[in-house]
């Protein structure tokens, strides 16, 4: 009988799940690839114990990605929630998005995003991606942009391009400033 290290079985399972996700995140950061064997070794569990929580490495990677995207959403929300001016909110969103990249946290999202996920999990990740961009859509609508979805995708493209530049080693401050200037110029043209 396995030892339960929490007040209830549900809490024990949640703690184990968190430990497995944390181990998978660490393995992914170190090697870019997650295997059940590597996660089992990292946690000190048997591979069969890992499979009690996750059917496959893809399911585990999906939880890593979902947790990291949720953290990114929280980071962005904290950056924009108290800003009333939609233009300044857009600037804060771009700045916060790229600070997340510059401090290295986005590398985990990129690595996990390259994995082949089960369709249900892929849909969950796509929903979270839409949540990431929700503040942009809201700000654009408040600015009177009638085709906010299209313009938001352009803003996302600018941020994605700056992300690749930062990850390639270009100075983050320069990329943030350029991305903000370019995005705002585009928004101004769309008004």
What is the role of each PLM region?
Residues 63, 77-103, 155:
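Hydrophobic alpha-helical connector segments
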Residues 59, 98-134, 164, 168:
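Short secondary-structure transition hinges
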Residues 13, 17, 61-65, 69, ...:
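Amphipathic, non-transmembrane alpha-helical scaffold segments
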Residues 95-99, 146-168, 172-186:
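Hydrophobic alpha-helical segments that form the core
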Residues 70-73, 118-153:
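Amphipathic alpha-helical packing segments from all-alpha helical-bundle domains
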Residues 1-30, 36-42, 59:
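Basic, helix-initiating cap at the start of DNA-binding domains
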Residues 43-54:
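Short hydrophobic/aromatic patch on the recognition helix
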């Amino acid at each position: 009988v396995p030892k339960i290290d929490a007040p209830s079985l549900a809490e024990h399972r949640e703690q184990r799940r968190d430990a497995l996700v944390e181990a998978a995140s660490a393995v992914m950061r170190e090697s870019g690839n997650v295997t059940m064997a590597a996660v089992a070794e990292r946690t000190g569990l048997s591979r069969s114990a890992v499979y009690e929580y996750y059917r496959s490495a893809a399911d585990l990677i999906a939880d890593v990605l979902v947790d990291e995207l949720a953290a990114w959403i929280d980071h962005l929300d904290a950056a924009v929630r108290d800003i009333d001016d939609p233009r300044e909110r857009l600037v804060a969103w771009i700045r916060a998005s790229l600070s997340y990249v510059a401090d290295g946290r986005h590398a985990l999202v990129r690595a996990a995003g390259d994995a082949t996920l089960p369709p249900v999990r892929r849909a969950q990740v796509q929903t979270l991606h839409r949540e990431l961009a929700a503040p942009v859509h809201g700000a654009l609508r408040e600015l009177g942009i009638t085709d906010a979805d299209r313009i938001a995708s352009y803003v996302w493209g600018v941020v994605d391009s700056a992300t690749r530049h930062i990850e390639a080693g270009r100075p983050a401050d320069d990329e943030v400033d350029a991305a903000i200037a370019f995005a705002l110029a585009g928004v101004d043209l769309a008004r």
